[in-house]
Amino acid sequence: MDSESQLLEGAVEKIGLIPRSIIRTINRFQQQLFPDAVEYFIQEFRVSRSQVLVSLQCLLTLIIIPLFIHFFAKTVFLTPCIEYVWNTYKTDIFLNSYQQEQALTEMRNFEEILYFDLLVQSNEEPVTQEGLPFTFLQHSQGSVDEEKTTAPITAYAVSNMGNPETATIAPQHLHGSVGGKLESEFRFTNPSFVGKNNVTGATTITAAIPLQKKLVDLAQSANKQSIAALTNLFADLLTLFSLIILFIRLKSQIIILKSFLIETFYSLNDTTKSFMLIFSTDLLVGFHSPRGWEIFLDFILSRFGLPHDENIILLFVATFPVLLDSVIKYWIFRYLNKISPSTVATYHAMIE
């Protein structure tokens, strides 16, 4: 208990009006005048070594244990449980409207690419019709009409891939509700089967299998994204809770770690400290920092499955860097100017 209290006393050093480097130099000079200076230096070396070991141990504990808890919880029980509950009790595959809009945009792009490929590869005359046209044959019950026509296929169809050659689907929204103007049933066929008598009483659509497979891929991808977002949310909350517990349990070690990091920073020369300050401020609140904050906020929203609102992102980018810049300037004026005035002078000289 006594050694720990001595270690804490050596780790915590109050900030005064006179720089600590001057006070430390005067104290060491006075201590060298006494006959027991050798024992004091040995004791000081032991305290310094213990401070380094405790700081490294505390730092590794704060890094390794939360990462291990996050990986173990996410892999072992969070992912299987959330996947089971989501696939069993949830009817929607989309977590929010932004995710649905992304899927629809990707589907429209795929329709345009598929339409372009059909125009390039087809020997028929190009058909100009709004949406993605497919050439199909209309059949009546028991008879075949040789007239060809076209009709667009929307991105709200949900496929039934039971047969690799023909698959029957109905126009539906991805949420599961029937929508659209078409209420008839579609039977998608392979282009090699068009014109044969294997389809009666239905509409045979040419080259619709790629579109059908793309719908299935988008639905599966959106479902996986929703499960991953919920898993990340609960795993990060559990990691944050474990980190709070570690901060409470390792309070004395964290004080030693904080003092060790501060002493390490102050032991650097003025040029190095000024360079680190300039690099940090330019990275966080510099001219090019808004784009970085946008990417960071976009990553956070995507990780937790939150909708992307441009107004919120722009408001955050416009206010948070300004607040952070004010805090950094206050810290430089209030604390660093008293502890190391030469560093502040070098910092302003490098900025100018």
UniProtKB/Swiss-Prot annotation:
Membrane topology of the entry: Multi-pass membrane protein
Coiled-coil features, chain-numbered ranges: none
Gene Ontology terms for molecular function: antiporter activity; proton transmembrane transporter activity
Transmembrane segments: 52-72, 227-247, 312-332
Catalytic activity of the protein: K(+)(in) + H(+)(out) = K(+)(out) + H(+)(in)
One Pfam short name: CemA
Superkingdom of source: Eukaryota
Subcellular locations according to the entry: Plastid, Chloroplast inner membrane
InterPro entries from the UniProt entry: CemA
Keywords, in A-Z order: Antiport, Chloroplast, Hydrogen ion transport, Ion transport, Membrane, Plastid, Plastid inner membrane, Potassium, Potassium transport, Transmembrane, Transmembrane helix, Transport
Keyword Membrane among UniProt keywords: yes
One GO term (biological process): potassium ion transport
Entry annotated with the keyword Cell membrane: no
Gene Ontology annotations for the cellular component aspect, listed alphabetically: chloroplast inner membrane
HAMAP family given in the database record: CemA_PxcA (MF_01308)
Family statement: Belongs to the CemA family.
Function description: Contributes to K(+)/H(+) antiport activity by supporting proton efflux to control proton extrusion and homeostasis in chloroplasts in a light-dependent manner to modulate photosynthesis. Prevents excessive induction of non-photochemical quenching (NPQ) under continuous-light conditions. Indirectly promotes efficient inorganic carbon uptake into chloroplasts.
Descriptive protein name: Potassium/proton antiporter CemA
Record organism: Oltmannsiellopsis viridis (Marine flagellate)
